[in-house]
Amino acid sequence: MTEGQTSNVPFEGVDSCGCGCGCNREDLPWSGRGTDLPITGCRFSLYPMTDDFVSIILGALDKTDASFVWSQSDALSTVYRGKREYVIDAVAALFANAWRDGVHMALEGQVSRGCPGDVSGDSVLSCEGEAPNAATVEAATQPALAKLSLYPLGVEDYIDDIAKVWYLAEERGLNPTSIHYATRIEGSIRDIFTYFNDVCALMEQTVSHYVLHFTINVNSPTDEEE
Amino acid sequence: MTEGQTSNVPFEGVDSCGCGCGCNREDLPWSGRGTDLPITGCRFSLYPMTDDFVSIILGALDKTDASFVWSQSDALSTVYRGKREYVIDAVAALFANAWRDGVHMALEGQVSRGCPGDVSGDSVLSCEGEAPNAATVEAATQPALAKLSLYPLGVEDYIDDIAKVWYLAEERGLNPTSIHYATRIEGSIRDIFTYFNDVCALMEQTVSHYVLHFTINVNSPTDEEE
């Protein structure tokens, strides 16, 4: 694991995690937490903008193999936790499986790893081999738009990381543009999620705690030439 | 303005803004940025889960007075920028104006202030007085669910702030619960957005740069007692 992180010890130093740290505050519900395990999580919500949204979501869940991740849903969102590549694989596949021609749909998500408020449980880390939905994701060539906001936490010198993430988007032909509070990209569903996976992989190399917030949408009716 | 922030100078020290800093990197599009102005922004997307989503969104935009903020929309999201209370007022009113009985709808947003990659333009800061949609927001008593993830950036000692934000939710009767990567709350549309406004006000007192990511939804078909 990366520097500064041991189980059940508050993350000292320059961390500024906002998802609820305070591991040494006994009055807060996340008191005493922390994990050494390489758990990546993605909390996300799927929004098909159609009267038929329930069956689209349930249908997509049926087709998606989420056996390589731990999962929990509530009335607001679902969270997958486990090895990063399998978490991204499952989210990408769910989105691809929910795609329906002509239906405008978005997925809003946050990928998080290394939060000092995290726990060692609620995860699956025992799987190996090819991601179970790899073929589905590979076939997801439908065009999509996306935006991302990346928070590398707890490090002073993060500019090179941010630059790498920008250049990676350029190299991948995702046409990044800078907008207030985010970076916008465009590409296929497959290429965008592959990029998110690689952004996360980059972050793992240099920061112990990061959060990537993203939106991806398809079949938008908005005509931006207007 | 708060410590460490002057125009066009990179934020030194422990900042770990991920929305694209690197003000001294001439190869990046946000080179040379920074602002002293008290601009708060909210980038958000509205998701009515119905075939009728376009007319719901356009209808809500028609009814919402966004004259106290600067605004720009694209195919993914809209951003409002200006004084915090007016930004939150406009977003809350848009959501309240879009509410339709029986229609499941969500709004996903990020409130941001103090990013060293920010600019002084694209904002309205000249307005005073009562927020233009105050009556609409006050009347928004419909029940809603929400989650929030708060990132106070650039400070070492933020735990007290996070604790205050948690306790504030308890005091307001919003029944906060800790979930992976976020805090969940429930209350009326009005009370939830009032809370978001107050969280942002708290953050302004102690950190120069924060981001609050949130989701709010209404009329969810999910039965959590199952």
Model-derived regions: residue spans:
Chain A
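Charge-rich, low-complexity N-terminal segments
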Residues: E3-E226
